[in-house]
């Protein structure tokens, strides 16, 4: 059996639609349409998702690329549980955690050339925003403060922080936040154009 019956949030039946869909404001979703026809995922195993209707789907995007190793992997669950029981979080401001240094060393062994320094973040948006700031800080430290140019791609998505939206090319995001986006960003054409078909 692919999915076992289990309750993991509370004693409520997680296969039903919650009593209220008002409090959770969902990104990139027509909340009105969602309320009329909710699409809920109740469980995941490997590359499969289970809906509240009991249907199984393939998770082709790894939940926005956040679960590339698959869902519900026992060895990952055990390793995470062990770490949470030992130390659940250690902020890296002027204090270190040995595990993060070990992970950085392991990653560095697999990266090309001199790409051997790691800066850990909590999500893709924060990673992009941090990379933008590192690039700006690097050139300022080298005496090139005027060097401030970024290249993005039309229709590109890099996250929802202001820097991410600035280098991204999602039309509605750029229109909505145009007055507060970073200067010095140019966009190259998207590859999905009629002449490329």
Region annotations inferred by a language model:
Residues 105-197:
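PLP-dependent aspartate aminotransferase-fold enzymes
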């Amino acid at each position: 059996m692919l999915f076992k019956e289990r309750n993991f949030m509370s004693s409520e039946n997680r296969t039903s639609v919650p009593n209220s869909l008002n409090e959770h404001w969902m990104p990139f979703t027509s909340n009105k349409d969602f309320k009329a026809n909710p699409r809920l995922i109740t469980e995941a195993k490997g590359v499969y998702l289970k809906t509240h209707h009991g249907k199984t789907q393939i998770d082709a995007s790894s939940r926005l690329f956040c679960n590339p190793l698959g869902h519900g992997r026992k060895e990952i669950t055990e390793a995470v549980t062990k770490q949470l029981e030992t130390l659940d979080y250690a902020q890296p401001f002027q204090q270190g955690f040995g595990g993060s240094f070990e992970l950085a060393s392991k990653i560095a062994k697999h990266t090309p050339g001199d790409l051997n320094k790691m800066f850990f973040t909590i999500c893709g948006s924060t990673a992009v925003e941090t990379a933008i700031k590192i690039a700006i800080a690097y050139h300022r430290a080298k005496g090139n403060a005027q060097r401030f140019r970024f290249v993005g791609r039309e229709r590109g998505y890099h996250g929802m922080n202001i820097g991410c939206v600035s280098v991204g090319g999602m039309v509605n995001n750029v229109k909505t936040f145009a007055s507060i986006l970073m200067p010095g960003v140019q966009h190259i054409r998207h590859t999905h154009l009629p002449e490329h078909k």
